[in-house]
């Protein structure tokens, strides 16, 4: 491939990705506020400019950037769910652009790059893509990738003017304004990276570089501020177990093991797609454990390759992604075991977090492919890539087939909103996907009185 065609590829594919995502959003959603929007309506509408709703003790857990965007949406657009959905799609596109810029800089091969983008813009994230309340999470991951990219070019000796300042300022902006709960892994992996890089530098030079300490401090301070704010938040987990972990761990240790393995398997084939395939008799349910084991093995092999070939001395980006992906799996296990379902970690809502590690694995293989001498290992890598392509391709196919049904669900919500009195509590809870019929009615009353969203 010529340099001109390669540059075209690196630019065109990250643009085609969000275009596909926006098309999918149009096909699978409609402008109807339900599910998580019920809580948002009751908490912030209609007086979205009220400072008392902004300056609250747990302000950081509510993600401050949401406030001006929500205020604009309500005041100017009449509370458009579609607006939020588009922001989410554009946020994913921005993240893809950052990853694409890294691939262009490192001259990742065309086949590897196309595989990377295929997985990056896959529909295994459908639950996030069709829930506008989570648009900011896509922006957060774009910011994470950008920070990792800046760190990578500084450490590889290709830093730009102002990069050191960026490394110190970005954590304050990202953690305090954009990241929300995702700041835990973002901050944790940066602290690990700075410690690791400081040790590597010390081994080379025989002295400690104070820059790593300052960078780590600039990560730690906003993280502590977030933790203080988070300590004042009150969370509601409908249907969750409220007791301690130890008794459950002793009584049902297998659930935790299955949860962890399945969360990795979900990155090959999303939960609903897997269940469809099992129900149709395409494959046994036990396949999820094989897929999960294969992904876990890929993590370990990619980590070993980074260390064996000292890839981190040339580029730290893949190693950071691998560490972040693994930490996300651990975090989801520790925070979501309370639902006592071993398949909960396979949910599409976590694919955005888990795919970070998949990107790191693929980039590691792409950058070291010519250096890997083991033919057996190369065969395993190719088989793993085929598995990822097939599983995610099947997920995309099933989701495209399901999209009209998701859109129809939203249209039914809009129809029901016009005459709520005709429906029972059970019908409202089921269709609006929220646990309280009374709160659904309260939220719809707010929208109706202020001529917002479905009542415009």
Which residue stretches match the model-derived regions?
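Hydrophobic/aromatic-rich transmembrane helices and adjacent perimembrane loops
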Residues: 136-140, 342-367
């Amino acid at each position: 491939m010529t340099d001109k065609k390669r540059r075209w590829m690196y630019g065109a594919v990250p643009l085609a990705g969000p275009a596909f995502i926006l098309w999918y959003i149009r096909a699978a959603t409609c402008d109807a506020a339900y599910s998580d929007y019920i809580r948002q309506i009751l908490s912030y509408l209609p007086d979205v400019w009220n400072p008392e709703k902004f300056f609250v003790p747990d302000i950081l857990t509510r993600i401050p950037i949401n406030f001006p965007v929500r205020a604009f949406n309500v005041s100017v657009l009449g509370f458009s769910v579609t607006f939020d959905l588009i922001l989410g799609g554009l946020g994913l596109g921005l993240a893809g652009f950052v990853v694409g810029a890294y691939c262009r800089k490192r001259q990742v091969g065309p086949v590897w790059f196309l595989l990377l983008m295929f997985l990056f813009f896959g529909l295994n994230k459908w639950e996030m893509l069709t829930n506008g309340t989570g648009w900011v999470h896509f922006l957060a991951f774009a910011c994470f990738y950008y920070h990792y990219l800046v760190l990578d070019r500084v450490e590889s000796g290709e830093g730009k003017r102002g990069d050191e300042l960026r490394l110190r300022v970005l954590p304050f902006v990202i953690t305090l304004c954009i990241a929300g709960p995702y700041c835990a892994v973002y901050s944790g992996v940066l602290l690990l990276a700075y410690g690791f890089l400081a040790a590597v530098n010390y081994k080379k030079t025989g002295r400690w570089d104070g820059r790593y300490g300052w960078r780590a401090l600039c990560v730690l301070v906003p993280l502590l501020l977030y933790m203080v704010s988070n300590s004042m938040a009150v969370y509601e987990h409908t249907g969750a177990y409220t007791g301690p972990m130890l008794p459950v761990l002793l009584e049902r240790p297998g659930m935790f093991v299955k949860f962890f393995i399945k969360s990795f398997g979900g990155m090959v084939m999303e939960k609903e797609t897997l269940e469809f395939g099992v129900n149709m008799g395409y494959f046994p349910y036990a396949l999820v454990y094989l897929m999960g084991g294969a992904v876990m093995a890929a993590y370990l092999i990619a980590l070993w390759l980074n260390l064996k070939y000292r890839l981190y001395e040339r580029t730290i980006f893949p190693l950071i992604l691998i560490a972040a992906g693994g930490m996300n799996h651990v975090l989801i296990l520790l925070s979501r075991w309370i639902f006592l379902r071993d398949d909960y970690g396979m949910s599409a809502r976590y694919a955005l977090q888990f795919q970070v590690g998949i990107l790191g694995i693929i980039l590691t293989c792409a950058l070291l492919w010519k250096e890997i001498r083991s033919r057996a290992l190369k065969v395993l890598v190719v088989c793993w890539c085929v598995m990822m392509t097939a599983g995610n391709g099947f997920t995309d196919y099933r989701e495209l087939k399901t999209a009209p049904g998701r859109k129809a669900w939203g249209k039914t919500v809009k129809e029901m909103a016009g005459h709520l009195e005709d429906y029972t509590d059970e019908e409202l809870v089921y269709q609006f996907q929220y646990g309280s019929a009374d709160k659904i009615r309260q939220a719809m009353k707010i929208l109706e009185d202020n001529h917002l969203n479905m009542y415009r």
